[in-house]
Swiss-Prot record:
Gene3D superfamilies: 3.30.1390.10. It comes from Bradyrhizobium diazoefficiens (strain JCM 10833 / BCRC 13528 / IAM 13628 / NBRC 14792 / USDA 110). The gene is clpS1. Belongs to the ClpS family. The lineage of its organism: Bacteria, Pseudomonadati, Pseudomonadota, Alphaproteobacteria, Hyphomicrobiales. HAMAP family: ClpS. PANTHER family: ATP-DEPENDENT CLP PROTEASE ADAPTER PROTEIN CLPS (PTHR33473:SF19), ATP-DEPENDENT CLP PROTEASE ADAPTER PROTEIN CLPS1, CHLOROPLASTIC (PTHR33473). This is ATP-dependent Clp protease adapter protein ClpS 1.
Length: 101
């Protein structure tokens, strides 16, 4: 007699999820000079002069504008660095992040 117990082979699939993306948003204020905002957008977000100007004007007209979309850590780092650059010069420049839907 054969008393061997046979177990079915089970496979586990590891599902790899992509990281959630977050938007970096420029909030308009009435004190930070346009040229400074454009300079920060070019430096921190590697935008061209034209791209930075369009984002800055959109934020000025609408009150806020999505600057870029990154993974959460990158978005928060860039938003913090850009906001800190404004604060270092005494401007109330503000970048925030929120999850992309």
């Amino acid at each position: 007699m054969n008393d061997a117990v046979t177990k079915p082979k089970t496979r586990t699939k590891t599902k790899v999820e992509r990281p959630k993306l977050h938007k970096v948003i420029l909030i308009n204020d009435d004190y930070t000079p346009r040229e400074f905002v454009t300079m920060i957008l070019k430096a921190e977000f590697r935008m061209t002069e034209d791209q930075a100007y369009k984002v800055m004007i959109t934020a000025h007209k609408l009150g806020a504008c999505v600057v870029a979309v990154f993974t959460r850590d990158v978005a928060e780092t860039k938003a913090t660095r850009a906001t800190d650059a404004g604060r270092a010069k005494g401007y109330p420049l503000l970048f925030t992040t929120e999850p992309e839907e």
